[in-house]
Amino acid sequence: MAKGSTIKIGLKCSECGDINYSTTKNAKTNTEKLELKKFSPRLNKHTIHKEVKLKS
């Protein structure tokens, strides 16, 4: 059985440093790091969240 090309990633808040969201992405088709504007519950506002690797 072949190993899948999807990896687990977390989305870390650039202001407070918390990892608030986790998701998966295809590492072969999306080579650049993901950067999304998401809600940070600690700061109670929308901030930039950047991709970090999670332990699988």
UniProtKB/Swiss-Prot annotation:
It holds the Pfam family Ribosomal_L33. InterPro entries: Ribosomal_bL33, Ribosomal_bL33_CS, Ribosomal_bL33_sf, Ribosomal_zn-bd. GO terms for biological process: translation. Keywords: Ribonucleoprotein, Ribosomal protein. It comes from the Bacteria. The keyword Ribosomal protein applies. GO terms for cellular component: cytoplasm; ribonucleoprotein complex; ribosome. One of its GO terms (molecular function) is structural constituent of ribosome. NCBIfam families: PRK00504.1 (NF001764), PRK00595.1 (NF001860), rpmG_bact (TIGR01023). Belongs to the bacterial ribosomal protein bL33 family. This is Large ribosomal subunit protein bL33. It comes from Helicobacter hepaticus (strain ATCC 51449 / 3B1).
